[in-house]
């Protein structure tokens, strides 16, 4: 018998992880990292929208030129509320997004829920 995948003990029902992968144009990684460090992340922190962030990552092997973010939300309503606040943050949108967008080739967003085994980030 296979166990159903669902919330773990102590987890809110339907906790979601959002994996956001941004593929950059070749040669633009250093510029993108600088924008995130100088403008993007400080704007999120100032607006209080950094609390759901698990981490930022850069690809190294396989598909390269990617920046990856992992976010953790209590449920879909929490996720939607978070992104509404992010995109209402003028420092983030006008100071960062408008400068970062031309560096991007593609954006991929995956919603994930935790399996009932393994580490619990």
Locate each region found by the language model:
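Short S/T/G/P-rich N-terminal loop/turn motif that feeds into the first structured element of a domain
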Residues: 1-121
